[in-house]
């Protein structure tokens, strides 16, 4: 049987991992064995955090809406309930934007929610 020499393939694999680890600190960017572990871990964090990002943004939007609603004399849950009863279909992302950048429009939405609750 012919001898299989894998130098080219191994070099390519190592280069690929070291390229992905570029910018990492110390041995994590220079030593293949350490860089491989760092790249695998980074991938796990990236996968997890892509899912967490969605949760964190929703939390941020809710916190902003709650703060703005309370300034207008209504709690978050009652405000959302009022909007649903008034059949206003604006998602939390847009509501948070309105709360931050257009306080007059947000106050009008709060009044609409209050009217629907009464």
Swiss-Prot record:
Binds directly to 23S ribosomal RNA and is necessary for the in vitro assembly process of the 50S ribosomal subunit. It is not involved in the protein synthesizing functions of that subunit. Belongs to the bacterial ribosomal protein bL20 family. It comes from Yersinia pestis (strain Pestoides F). This is Large ribosomal subunit protein bL20. It holds the Pfam family Ribosomal_L20. SUPFAM superfamilies: Ribosomal protein L20. Keywords: Ribonucleoprotein, Ribosomal protein, RNA-binding, rRNA-binding. HAMAP family: Ribosomal_bL20 (MF_00382). One of its GO terms (biological process) is translation. CDD domains: Ribosomal_L20. NCBIfam families: rplT_bact. GO terms for molecular function: rRNA binding; structural constituent of ribosome. GO terms for cellular component: ribonucleoprotein complex; ribosome.
């Amino acid at each position: 049987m012919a001898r299989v020499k894998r130098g080219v393939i191994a070099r390519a694999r190592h280069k690929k991992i070291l390229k992905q680890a570029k910018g990492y600190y110390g041995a994590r960017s220079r030593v293949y064995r350490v860089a491989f572990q760092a790249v695998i871990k980074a991938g796990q964090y990236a996968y997890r955090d892509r899912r967490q990002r969605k949760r964190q943004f929703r939390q941020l939007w809710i916190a902003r809406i709650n703060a703005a609603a309370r300034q207008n004399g209504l709690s978050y849950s009652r405000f959302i309930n009022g909007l649903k009863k008034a059949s206003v279909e604006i998602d939390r992302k847009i509501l948070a934007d309105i709360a931050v950048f257009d306080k007059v429009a947000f106050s009008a939405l709060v009044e609409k929610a209050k009217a629907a609750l009464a």
